[in-house]
UniProtKB/Swiss-Prot annotation:
Gene that this polypeptide is encoded by: trt2
EC number in record: 2.5.1.-
Catalytic activity: 3,5-dimethylorsellinate + (2E,6E)-farnesyl diphosphate = (3R)-3-farnesyl-6-hydroxy-2,3,5-trimethyl-4-oxocyclohexa-1,5-diene-1-carboxylate + diphosphate + H(+)
Consequence of gene loss (knockout): Impairs the synthesis of terretonin but accumulates 3,5-dimethylorsellinic acid (DMOA).
Protein name: Polyprenyl transferase trt2
Length: 342
């Protein structure tokens, strides 16, 4: 069977579909789609492009959000560890955990699209994704998903055994996420599993997260708050169409107070980050750069994005630049603390 076979109904989508779906806004077909002539997708062979789209390699925001917590986790652990950690070990863990975050993001996108295929056909922003438009068969997508998660499992062999437990928690919630919108108004809260990157990074460096329970918890709340804040703002783009097809989310449930909700998560993140460092004795470099950079980057993101309206096409680009800027400042503050203690 050709790998790019035309789609029939997906067994997964038949089981996990809404019973009250209206007629599609416009059913997606391959002829509706034109590949972008710019960006990374334009440089790939035509046979590879649908798979690259499935993994969202042209949408780096998700990769930032999945990889940056591991980067922060390594930097934070270096700054608070009871003994000075060698730079070579830190670099090794940074590379392995970044690859793990990349694979979890990639596999999660493919899995999400497998489960949401029929729903994606109803939403204008997603109806031309590779699975809904028939560019990839469900079987091929499922096989690719399994291979990606398998590669992630192989990476765990390079880390201490405790990391396998933490990786299992992260993977479980990643697989659960696409079902959240069917059963709850709070699917974004499932994304807090990404915050488990902090204890996983600590364990990878053989620093027990339970030795510092309050600071570790604060850092997890910090990461979770940032992830949910960005996802709530981003989800507002689809809120109206989600209402029509019965999809549930915090953006739908709290559509009248999205601004207040987003700012609430922003302040939660800033306070938790501050506590996570102060409880471990981090000082001025951390407060000025890590906390100050967080406030500057994401306060600007919210003021501009919510000011323009959450349906603005610039939401993703604003989130991407803010996340990248904030990550640089987070790591810089921790790195300066690490140097001061070395």
């Amino acid at each position: 069977m050709p790998i790019l076979a035309p789609l029939g109904p997906s067994p997964l989508s038949e089981v996990f579909t809404y019973s009250n779906l209206p007629s599609p806004v416009e059913m997606a077909t391959g002829k509706d789609y034109r590949h972008s002539k710019a960006g990374i997708l334009s440089k790939l062979p035509p046979s590879i492009k649908p798979y690259a789209e499935l993994l969202r390699i042209h949408r780096p925001l998700g990769y930032y959000l999945n990889i940056s917590p591991y980067v922060v986790g390594v930097a934070y652990t270096a700054a608070i560890a009871p003994v000075s950690l060698p730079a070579t070990v830190l670099l090794n863990r940074l590379i392995i955990l970044s690859l793990w975050g990349f694979l979890i993001r990639s596999g999660g996108c493919a899995w999400n699209d497998l489960i949401d295929m029929d729903i994606d056909r109803q939403v204008s922003r997603t109806k031309l994704r590779p699975l809904p438009r028939g560019a990839i068969s469900p079987t091929s997508a499922a096989l690719l998903t399994a291979i990606i998660f398998g590669c992630g499992g192989l990476l765990l062999l390079l880390l201490p055994s405790q990391c396998t437990v933490e990786a299992g928690i992260i993977l479980f919630f990643a697989l659960l996420y696409p079902f959240g919108k069917r059963f709850s108004d709070y699917p974004q809260l499932i994304l807090v599993n990404i915050a488990w990157a902090i204890p996983m990074a600590m364990s990878s460096l053989e620093v027990d997260p339970l030795d510092f329970p309050y600071s570790t918890l604060s850092m997890c709340i910090f990461i979770a708050s940032v992830i949910v804040m960005i996802d709530v703002v981003y989800a507002c783009q689809d809120a109206e169409e989600d209402k029509k097809i019965g999809a549930r989310s915090m953006a739908v449930r709290y559509s009248d107070i999205t601004d207040q909700l987003a700012y609430g998560f922003f302040f939660s993140g800033a306070i938790s980050l501050l506590l996570g460092g102060v409880l471990r004795g981090l000082g001025l470099p951390f407060i000025v750069f890590s906390v100050g950079g967080h406030i500057f980057g994401f306060l600007r993101f919210l003021s501009v994005t919510l000011g323009e309206g959450t349906k603005s096409a610039s939401v993703e680009s604003r989130a991407k630049s803010s996340c990248l800027l904030a990550t640089v400042f987070w790591v810089l503050g921790f790195f300066l603390e690490y140097l001061a203690r070395s």
